[in-house]
Amino acid sequence: MLGEDWNSRRLRKALIEEYPYLQPRNVWTDKIAEDYDYEYIRGEHELPEGWFELFLQMCEDIREPLIKADYLNEFRFSQLKEKYGSMRVYTFGATSEVNDIIAKYEFLSQQICCVCGKPATTQTYGWICPYCFEHVKNSGEKLDDCAVIDIKTSYVRRIWSAGSHMETVVDCSDEWQRYLKRIGYTDD
């Protein structure tokens, strides 16, 4: 879907049919506005543009577990945003499998340019944001004032349960490779 016209109501309608949780609803009543005309979809204006393809890939990955749990039409995002240089996804309840998938994509977002969606090379200080080399130059930040990002495709998840501590390595390499393929990225 990269490069498609996001202003297309046809595209928005198709996305909502595939992922009903993208349809905006009233936060208090959970109802869809009677005059809703596919003017926007959930996440479109809430996340940096560079992360939207990653977000849609996450939506694809959570769809099957939601169907399996018979929760596809009830699942809702409560908030989507950027915070401390990563995508944050809050829900109105999800299965542990869906939460695990969301956590992977939140981790991967830290390594994706928030402007264009390419792999990030730098991260700014102050207002933390990952940028590719091209966009950090346009951000007004001095390169000397930025941290270099070493792309990682796994992270350590720490769980505390019944007074004991357990660590697990979470591998995101499949999701990362699918994302790079999705955006047509090559190292050339």
PLM feature segments, named:
Residues 66-70, 110-114, 140:
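Residue-level signal for secondary-structure boundary elements
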Residues 113-116, 129-132:
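Short cysteine-rich clusters marking metal-coordination/redox-active sites
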Residues 124-131, 141-149:
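Short cysteine/histidine-rich zinc-coordinating motifs and their immediately flanking basic loops
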Residues 119-122, 137-140:
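Short functional micro-motifs and their immediate structural scaffolds
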Residues 1-99, 155-188:
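Long, charged N-terminal interaction/targeting segments
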